[in-house]
Every structure is written in structure tokens, then in C-alpha cells.
Amino acid sequence: MKVICVGDSITRGQVSANYVKMLESRLPGTTVINAGVNYDVSAHVLDRLSEVVDQDPDVVTVLIGTNDATATLGETTARKLRDRWKLAEDISADGYAANLSAIATRLKDETRARIALISPPVLGEDLDSTALRRTSEFGEIVRKVAAEQFVQYLPLNEQMVAHLEKADRTPRVHYRADSLLAPTAAMQHFFLGRGFDSIAKSRGLLLTTDTVHLNSRGAGMIADLIEGVVRSS
């Protein structure tokens, strides 16, 4: 069986705990391919989908939306992403829905794969923040698209929110587009050899290392959801 995991840096797993590697260790005999691209957005996933289709997968999971969501939170981020991917149109919730629907349609039309769309992880761990609520709004878009396209929906965002609600802790750090949390986490990991869980703990974070990328608990939630899809296929 061949499983392709499509996504952004959270899937790529260089500056985030790597859920794709978790799946590889849990699913011996299964080929698990990492199709994550750092900074990716839904429009660019649609543009590069031939790379996925051409590999004749049995299962395709799509976890995209974090960068789309951040683009709707600030013009500076939006401009950087538009320029990076040379996008003709602004990034928006409506555009995200259209792109995700087109991704699902093409995968259905051009592969025999079982398809699963995953709601985006949380941005920050403050349940009352605009950033976290925005990811939940984008998660609802994913749920609706999956229902309309008759593909599987994996409720990652909902599971993360439930985990944070149960923990009932006030985070010490918060998501900000101009935060140095992500680059300093990367420096600690690559130059000092600190694990992502250690970095998260030092910042009082439960699921993320820098309010965007994931520690092993957060990545493990994704692996759990995808493993369930693969084992039932």
C-alpha cells in the first residue's frame, strides 16, 4: 500500500515533529511518502498535484490551511505568501474552500485513492484568540468540503481544541505573525540539539513548539488519525 501525505511544513517535518515518520514506524510494509512543502498554501498544492497523481497512491491525506489561515490574519503575511508562490489572487477563506474542493475533485477523478481531508492544527494555544478561532473556522470549511466531495474528514482541529479545553491552562506565549518563536525554536533544535518536546515544555506549550509547528503530542494526533484511515483501507 502506498500512502501520500500532502501538506506544508507541518507535514514536511523539518521544523516540526514528523508525523510522517511516526506513520512509517507504525505501518511496516506500507510505503508512506512525504509530500509536504514548507510555507505551502492550498493554491500551490493544487498546482503541484500532478506529483501526487503520478505516483498512483492508495491513500492520500491532505493537511493544508495553516498558511492560508495566517494570510487572512495580516497583510504582511499575505503579501509574503502571494509573492513566494506567485499567486494571481489574494488568499481568502473562499479561495481556500474552492482550492480544497478542486484538490479533492482532481484526486477523485485521476486516482483510485482513498482521500482524507484533515482540518488544520491550532495556531497558538489560547482558546479565546483570533488566531486559534480562525483555524477552527478553516476546519469547518474542510469539514464542509469533505462532505460535499464525499471524502473522509479527519477532525484534527477539534481534537486539539478539546485537548486544550481539558487541560484548562493559560498559555505563556501567544501566536503572532512577527514572533521569533519559530526561528528560535529551529535554532535550538538544529544548532543546540534540543528536542521539540523540550522546547515546547520550556515555553509552557502542550501541542506546539512555537504556536505553529508541533511537538510529538500534536504530531501524534495526526499520525493517529491517518493510521486509522490506512488500517481500515
Regions found by a protein language model. Give the residues of each.
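Short histidine/acidic/glycine/proline-rich micro-motifs that form metal-
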Residues: 9-12, 36-40, 122-125
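Alpha-helical cap/lid subdomain in secreted, periplasmic
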Residues: 18, 22-26, 46-233
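A structural signal for the hydrophobic beta-strands that form the central parallel beta-sheet
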Residues: 5-6, 34, 117, 208
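Catalytic nucleophile-elbow at a beta strand-turn-alpha helix junction centered on a G-D-S/GDSL motif
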Residues: 1-16, 67-69
